[in-house]
């Protein structure tokens, strides 16, 4: 038995999320099918983060155990060839042979996410499924200042899905930066782990600050209320990217 670490990139627009689901097109299902086509084994891959439908990744990490100790280039080339043949918008960026002690989910110490907002009057013609389009002008500086109220260890009940299965709403948010680059606004988030819909909830609430409807104090009060009803709208999945996992 040999364990391998896979680093993946994918456009989540046409997938029902990462997790394998019967009769639905998922990222996990597509990669496991590629593994079966290559090795003849029905294997389950373990991932660092189970992204939702429509969410993208540029640095997703997974691990898989093969019976045979294949050369990493053989795995890399074979999986990408099958994914390309099947028309999947998934790429294996890197394959590494790793110790059995490595676990893509449990060994992760930090997860990095990016949320992209296109802030202009004209709608996106090319990247409609890869950004959140907001035509109303946003004050990115105000959004960034307000976002700092969320950094640190908090009960994030306000900013998690009502269907979140995490045992505790307490998380330590290490970074939440907001930066404008031309017509785009980028939200950068980093933590050991996140709650379901947490970053999309941040994005929707910070949008309220950006248009001037909320102040930084309003955002802070929403956090301390620990009440899902106090959250702003949940931003669409199209703008969210898992960019990196640290071990």
Curated annotation (Swiss-Prot):
Reaction catalyzed: uridine(38/39/40) in tRNA = pseudouridine(38/39/40) in tRNA
EC number(s) from the headed UniProt entry: 5.4.99.12
Residues at which substrate binds: 113
Gene Ontology BP terms: tRNA pseudouridine synthesis
Keyword annotations: Isomerase, tRNA processing
Residue positions of the active site: 52 (nucleophile)
GO MF terms held by the record: RNA binding; tRNA pseudouridine(38-40) synthase activity
Recorded family membership: Belongs to the tRNA pseudouridine synthase TruA family.
Function summary: Formation of pseudouridine at positions 38, 39 and 40 in the anticodon stem and loop of transfer RNAs.
NCBIfam families in alphabetical order: hisT_truA
Subunit details: Homodimer.
Record PANTHER family: PSEUDOURIDYLATE SYNTHASE, TRNA PSEUDOURIDINE SYNTHASE-LIKE 1
Protein name: tRNA pseudouridine synthase A
Species of provenance: Bartonella bacilliformis (strain ATCC 35685 / KC583 / Herrer 020/F12,63)
Gene: truA
């Amino acid at each position: 038995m040999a364990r391998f670490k896979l680093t993946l990139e994918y456009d989540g627009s046409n997938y029902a999320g990462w997790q394998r689901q019967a009769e639905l097109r998922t990222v996990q299902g597509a990669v496991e099918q590629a593994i079966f086509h290559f090795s003849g084994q029905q294997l389950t891959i373990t991932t660092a983060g189970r992204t939702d439908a429509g969410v993208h990744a540029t640095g997703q990490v997974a691990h898989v155990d093969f019976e045979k100790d294949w050369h990493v280039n053989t795995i890399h080339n074979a999986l990408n060839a099958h994914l390309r043949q099947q028309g999947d918008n998934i790429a294996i960026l890197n394959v590494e042979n790793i110790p059995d002690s490595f676990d893509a989910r449990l060994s992760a110490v930090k997860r990095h996410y990016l949320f992209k907002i296109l802030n202009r009057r004209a709608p996106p013609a090319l990247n409609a499924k890869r950004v959140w389009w907001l035509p109303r002008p946003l004050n990115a500086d105000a959004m960034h200042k307000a976002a700092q109220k969320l950094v640190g260890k908090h009960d994030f009940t306000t900013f998690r899905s009502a269907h979140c299965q995490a045992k505790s709403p307490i998380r330590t948010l290490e970074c939440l930066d907001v930066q404008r680059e031309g017509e785009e606004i980028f939200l950068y988030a980093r933590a050991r782990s996140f709650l379901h819909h947490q970053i999309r909830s941040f994005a929707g609430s910070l949008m309220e600050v950006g248009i001037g409807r909320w102040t930084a104090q309003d955002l802070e009060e929403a956090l301390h209320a620990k009440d899902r009803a106090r959250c702003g709208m949940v931003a669409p999945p199209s703008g969210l990217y898992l960019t990196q996992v640290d071990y």
